[in-house]
Amino acid sequence: MTYLLNERICALFRSNWQHTLTYWSVFFSFGLCVAFLGPTILDLRCQTQSTLQEITLVFFSQQFFLFLGSTIGGFFSKTLVSSLSSLAVSTLIISVVFAIIPLCRELLMLAFAMAVSGLAMGTIDTISNLQLVKIYQKDSTVFLQALHFFVGLGALVSPLIADPFLSDTSCVIGNSSVNTTSLEDLRNKLAGRHVHNVSNVHLHTDGEVVTNVSYAFWIMAIINLPVPIAIFVLVYRERLFMCGSDPSRRLLDGDVLAIKPRGTSILAEDTGQKETSNSHADLFSCCLLGKAHSFPLSFFGIHVLGGLVLFFSDGIVGSYTGFVYTYAVAPPMNLPHKTAGYLTCIFWAAITTGRLSAIPLSYRFKPVRLLIVSQVGVIVTVLLLLIFSNSSVFLFIGTCCLGLFISSIFPCMLALTEDILEYKGCATTVLVTSAGMGEMVLQVLVGSVMHSRGSFSFLLCGMIFGCLGFTFFTFLYFVQQSHKSYTEALPGNSPVERHEENGIKTCSAAVLNSWDAPEHKTSLDP
């Protein structure tokens, strides 16, 4: 069975390899944008000749517009041409932003550039997740894990590119200088996504600017440039230009036809098209109040609960990357600044490794099982960090374990929720938006609590967020059972039949027709 499963997934990938690789490369661009701001923020402060308090506003600018981009990204995904066009424009914008950042000599110009990049990142986040889910459906977990692996890969590559060009001493030469050690400590402190409590840090704002960080941004712009080119090639290959194609072509039309064999009968083609229409025609109908009466409460409950799970899980990721350094250098840890600076890198490396290792695990285990292990692992890890709060060694071990456990929650949750809703509604848009909101809101909350209650509250907040996430996941399980019973009881609205060939469930009617084994087809209980 495992061999046949791998064979089917490989067949799906071969039929959609260009789409899939394009979406993965797009998320690499997303990862580049995620991590470049922290290491380069001091050089950008010098470039704009602003204070440290003022330059940290660009963090909020990028994060807020990333949230907005995640929200509006779903509205560009109704057709294949609009989806690919949005991705091409967004990735091209990222390259342009990288190229013009060295030219932004004013703080407002830099904040505007970060806002534009955040908007592009949010659009990429929603559309890429949505397209992979719609292509692979039941098998999307494997490909979503790989998709989010490329985020971590980009987040690791970006600081490595920037590091050789960062200033070792004060990059604004004034009447006096800031020693190298202080600048390195500040850069380590700014390695997170958000920065607080910097009002007591004073650096020169007037004087001669000496920085080579421009080369880092231009290199990243060049590295990212093949991504929009690849998308335009894909658009050309699919013949989606407006002058020679139907602009209303649905998102899955090309994908379903791509995996349909040449010998498929007309009846099978009609069946596949009917299923596609029923499953995806009303992608955003759950967001329209006029049609709300046609859905049960459990339908909306699944959206809300799934969003809350990712709200807290991504909130943990954001707050941990933003404040683990502050926690490590404060009592009772009192780690050296340079040593504490490695924690954020270790956390991102663990997330990247976890997503890579989750790819083969997704072949063997259902998303719900991976989610249970991940959620429990997060809670246990944070609990152990609380118990061994005086151990600097366990802080590094716990950081690594936390990254490994939390890495696969987002892709598994996305695949599970879409599967429950049978790929109807706007689950992907809601989940991606909720994750972005959690990352933005909970970072501010943790920063405020740490400022008023001390560094120990950092882990306590993580424990509370982890428990809340697992609680909402438990509620989701019971609501899912209620939703399943409701949909099965509706007259004339039985769930889409799932077939099994040689013990393997197919993900769509088109895929079913691509397997030449007409015998032993039986329906399966989802």
UniProtKB/Swiss-Prot annotation:
What is the name listed in the Swiss-Prot or TrEMBL entry for this protein?
Answer: Major facilitator superfamily domain-containing protein 4A
The organism is Danio rerio
Coiled-coil positions are none
Q: Where in the cell is it found?
A: Membrane
Instruction: List the signal peptide residues.
Output: none
Quote one Gene Ontology molecular function term: transmembrane transporter activity
Instruction: Give yes or no: UniProt keyword Signal.
Output: no
Keywords recorded for this protein, A-Z: Membrane, Transmembrane, Transmembrane helix, Transport
What does the similarity note say? Answer: Belongs to the major facilitator superfamily.
Regions crossing the membrane: 21-41, 55-75, 84-104, 107-127, 142-162, 215-235, 297-317, 341-361, 377-397, 401-421, 430-450, 458-478
Q: Name one GO cellular component term.
A: membrane
Pfam families on file: MFS_1 (PF07690)
The protein's topology relative to the membrane is:
Multi-pass membrane protein
Tell me, in one coarse class, where this protein mainly resides.
Answer: membrane
Q: Does the keyword Transmembrane apply?
A: yes
